[in-house]
């Protein structure tokens, strides 16, 4: 190969790309890696100042086997690194800010970063905060007109203690282990109603059994996933007014009542309703069964199940199947549109509602049983199918 061809082949083509394109490429890297490119050449030295996405994570360095002193040093250096990046970027527009970090008892440093990116008009905010204490979410997070996506999670509860919300552009909201200063339920309802463009709602580790009511009301919502941790108490009142919802994933203890259930557009539902441990004990007690015990006290899933009866695809947990037996004070509704049904099985759970459910699915095409790998009780299936 000639020296001329060698010289041509060794040209730094990437460095000759436009700044905007290079910054776009760097935006896909973790910020620590993007920052390391500044040593490649003078051309790269200040590109980080204009990268529109920041992905900051110090959890990858915080390993259990690492000594305490080393962990503290890494946390300190991480904070200094974030401070430098913030100073370098100044007030440049920011599209996404993702932060995973472990903090001590003082969250002011983290809150300062969050408030800074909010001032810069960030569109996507993704926070994972590992803390031994409740983390008070800065009120401004819930009063930001530029946010399109907000995801908040961590190792402990996040506290929302504000009375006003304003998130007019928010389309995606993911919250994990959130508690509200007012435990009555109104703040949660106000939060949802303040998100006029909301399309996806994910709530994990919710604890609303002590609320006076819980209401999910939004004409724009299309997908909802809610997983409630409470198991010992039945929620007092749960309502859904989501006429354009197409997908629902709902795990909760059966409520005392469901005053409003509006799922007019629902296509697919994954139902994980369950009874409290006391209700399960009473339901499975052979003496109670002998004396005709058929209904659990203090809970009624009938109105909720009536609300989902138009779905085309449905998944029922084994506990939800038992809820149909004991917690539906009205008859199990007819699922005229149901084509695909998946039922989780458990040898401890009552199957009495299954024959009725199948009779009430006149257009069912696919039936799948999720059977635990350690057991296959075909004799039970044969018995139930013989009665359908």
Curated annotation (Swiss-Prot):
Keywords associated with the record: Leucine-rich repeat, Repeat
F-box domain segment(s): 11-64
LRR repeats: 151-177, 180-205, 228-252, 313-345, 346-371
Gene3D superfamilies: 1.20.1280.50, Ribonuclease Inhibitor (3.80.10.10)
A Pfam short name: F-box
Full protein name: F-box/LRR-repeat protein At3g59190
Lineage: Eukaryota, Viridiplantae, Streptophyta, Embryophyta, Tracheophyta
């Amino acid at each position: 190969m000639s020296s001329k061809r060698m010289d041509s082949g060794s040209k730094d083509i990437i460095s000759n790309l436009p700044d905007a394109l290079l910054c776009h490429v760097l935006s896909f890297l973790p910020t620590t890696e993007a920052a390391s490119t500044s040593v490649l050449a003078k051309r790269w030295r200040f590109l980080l100042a204009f990268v529109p996405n920041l992905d900051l994570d110090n959890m990858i360095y915080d390993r259990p086997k690492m000594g305490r002193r080393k962990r503290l040093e890494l946390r300190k250096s991480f904070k200094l690194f974030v401070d430098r990046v913030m100073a370098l970027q100044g007030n440049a527009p920011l599209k996404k800010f993702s932060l995973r970090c472990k903090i001590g008892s003082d969250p002011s440093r983290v809150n300062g970063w969050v408030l800074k990116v909010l001032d810069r008009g960030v569109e996507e905010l993704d926070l994972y905060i590992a803390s031994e204490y409740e983390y008070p979410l800065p009120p401004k997070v819930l009063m930001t007109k530029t946010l399109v996506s907000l995801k908040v999670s961590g190792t402990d509860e996040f506290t929302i203690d504000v009375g006003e919300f304003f998130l007019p552009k928010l389309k995606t909201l993911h919250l994990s282990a959130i508690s509200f200063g007012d435990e009555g339920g109104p703040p949660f309802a106000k939060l949802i109603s303040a998100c006029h463009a909301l399309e996806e709602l994910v709530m994990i580790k919710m604890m609303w059994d002590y609320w006076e009511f819980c209401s999910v009301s939004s004409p724009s919502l299309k997908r909802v996933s809610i997983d409630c941790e409470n198991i010992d108490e039945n929620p007092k009142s749960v309502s859904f007014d989501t006429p354009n919802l197409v997908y629902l994933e709902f795990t909760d203890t059966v409520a005392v009542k469901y005053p409003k259930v509006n799922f007019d557009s629902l296509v697919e539902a994954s139902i994980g309703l369950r009874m409290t441990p006391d209700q399960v004990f009473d339901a499975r007690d052979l003496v109670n069964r002998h004396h005709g015990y058929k209904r659990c006290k203090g809970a009624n899933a009938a109105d909720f199940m009536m609300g989902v009866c138009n779905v085309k695809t449905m998944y029922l947990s084994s506990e939800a199947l038992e809820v149909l037996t004991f917690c539906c004070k009205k008859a199990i509704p007819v699922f005229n549109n149901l084509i695909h049904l998946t039922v989780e099985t458990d040898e401890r759970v009552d199957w009495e509602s299954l024959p009725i459910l199948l009779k009430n699915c006149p257009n069912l095409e696919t039936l799948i049983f999720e059977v635990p790998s350690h057991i296959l009780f075909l004799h039970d299936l044969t018995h139930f199918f013989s009665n359908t």
